[in-house]
């Protein structure tokens, strides 16, 4: 059985259209015109136990709305989602004991309490037995390295410390599923690496199923077993990082370093489809569709036109592929 099961999930919002001006405002108040906005459209996917799924899309794609339905905050218009065999909107008090949630821009910690006291309060909220609580704290201290600031008030913690503390809070009751929304937002490189290592260790040691939303594509490459991409509430890709690169990473770039003093123009590649040529001084970059053109032919032609000091092939990385998706180029 899948840990996360989503079938034909749909969420519509009804909004009032307001006309401009005083008359328009009065007319809208007396005779409001309603429009239905489809935020999530017929989403279907499953996540098996222990998988880390990168749930990604541009701003406004429907990610947050989907997460709110999966966590039980919003009720679907139609379709359903089931987490660990439970419907999130049914008996939420019991359901939330199966999940942990971290929102990168919001904290679940109490601002004026010491971090250790915050965990004690959460222990009571989640009915965590004393023996399990101490065992969990030992594990989370080791993985997330909380010991240096666990006695400090939450308001004094740095952003990186607070994020580690929030992840620990979400894992205190040993949830089966962890929802991470932008867990590395605003963090410096070294802190991001520490957070990623901690997430990987927790996933491997406890088989925690993780659904990750992020705009940091390094998170996706380093953490995710699979990517589920949506746009305008609909699925546009479901597969592994390697499948994404294989299917959509056909654009490659040949970068040439020219011997100085060559000022003649490039003529062979002008106007060719799926190829762009950019020359800046002694640097010549040719981007091309590798399913349409052979790199060996391009190199041969360029060597006949110019004296070359060096060259290298650059594959399209995941960040560029997803950027092209967002721009509707793929």
Residue ranges: model-predicted function:
Residues 112, 153-157:
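Conserved ABC ATPase signature
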